[in-house]
Amino acid sequence: HRSRISAGWGDVATIIPWQHYMAYGDLRMLERQYPSMKKWVDYITSQTENDLWSKGNSYGDWVFFSYADDKDGRSAVTIRPFIQQCFYAHSLDLVVRTARLLGRTEDAAKYEALHKRAVDAFRNEYVTPNGMLVSDTQTAYTLALMFDLLPEAQRAGAAKRLVDNVNRYGHITTGFLGTPYICEVLTRFGYEDVAYELLLNKKIPSWLYPISMGATTIWERWNSMLPNGMVNSNSMVSFNHYAYGAIGDWLYRWAAGLQEAAPGFREIRIKPYLNDHFTSMKAEQRTPYG
């Protein structure tokens, strides 16, 4: 239903076909899904004003870290229009790449122009001349860096602000949309030590906190169970959810260092990012080539 269209969720229309292509190197998925990829970005484009996607009822950075009694504004709120613009630009970029692969030259030119306008609008609306973002959150810097939305000269500074934010809180604060990318962004910009600190933190909120509470599945919330063993009183509590399990992607691709250097792993790059906390690490990747 159009009233429930949400950035990040709806963008599976572009993200999944592209990831499938990168994993298997099979253009048929892109060929089959190309019409729906275009329909998604065309619809979002129809909802923009001045190239900004700010309409709608997006979920935002779902279940990000927040304080119950937030009198000093420390909850990690990333404004929803910011997130929407990030994913709008990202989906446009994926459609451009797909159009080029499929030989749709007119489409590629059309969506490339839209992508440039979306990025320019993002920078004008949400980035200060000094590279600060309107939402000073881990998710904001993560998405802006992951999707290459900042000018090259501002990216290193933004990565440093992301690290400063992590150090200021002492833990992760991202929700569903920032969590899949934060450790990758940190590693790409030379802060893999900070990514490992997030991975190995055992205090709430963290990946290892649920394990310390006996969890054998991924929770929907960082604090679905409280330290006293009581279930979170929030009406929406799931003890078997997918989102924060996205750290597994970073473990394979960055910690163990198994990445495709060409679609379908026709070429593979092996570059582990090591850490003193591990004496060994083992991983394997099944590909169309073995």
Locations of the language-model features?
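Long, charge-rich low-complexity segments
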Residues: I16, G25, L143, G190-D193, ...
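Zinc-dependent metallohydrolase catalytic domains
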Residues: D120, P180, S280
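Non-catalytic C-terminal accessory modules of carbohydrate-active enzymes
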Residues: A113, D193-G290
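Flexible loop/turn segments at secondary-structure boundaries
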Residues: D61-F64, I182, P205-W207, H277
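Well-ordered alpha-helical segments within folded domains of soluble proteins
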Residues: A7-Q19, P81-V96, T137-D148, G175-T187, ...
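Extracellular polysaccharide-recognition and catalytic grooves
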Residues: T128-M236
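Generic, well-ordered alpha-helical scaffold segments in large soluble proteins
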Residues: I16-A23, W40-Y43, Q47, S91-T98, ...
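Active-site acid/base region of carbohydrate-active enzymes
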Residues: H1-R4, G8-D11, A23-C86, A99-M146, ...
